[in-house]
Amino acid sequence: SENGFILDRWWSLESLVSDSRQNQITDERTAIEMLETGLIESIKLQSIADVPLGAFLSGGIDSSSIVSLMQQHSSRPVKTFTIGFEEDRYNEAVYAKNIAKHLGTEHIELYMSSSDALSIIADLPQIYDEPFADSSQIPTHLVCCQARSEMKVALSGDGGDELFGGYNRYFWAQRIWNKVGWLPKPLRSILSNIITTIP
């Protein structure tokens, strides 16, 4: 174009779904290899940076997979960051520490208390673009603040559960819709209000 910009579609969900339906993978081994290849390619593309790069590590499957592939393709230890909680029932830092040790990353932990979490709640509307019902936004913000002093780019496993259906709500949503989708909207609204009042 005359100003040096070209407008082009980078990615299309509709095209991806259409292509996937036409070229279904029926072999588990092929699916695993394609997934690994796609993840490695994505990580390599995201790792092209002229600034220090690291990752957020929770010890869960998603972030552990990302960090594992990063470390596998890195010539030096990847810097990993995790948030730990003083309350044992919320603390997953021990899992992250074990994964970091196994992978040989340069691991940094920050522990937070309930008061640390409460202190940033008032700032959340300014930090995030839109409201969302995920309490992980608090530790995510804190780990970002922690990592900022060490690096400018960090990869994470965020979105893995949504992408791979890791939450039961995604499994049940379609089943529930198949049962009640035919009902008129006013009746669905009444049912929704009743369901949300159940403790």
What are these regions (language model features)?
Residues 9-14:
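Short beta->alpha transition motifs characteristic of CBS
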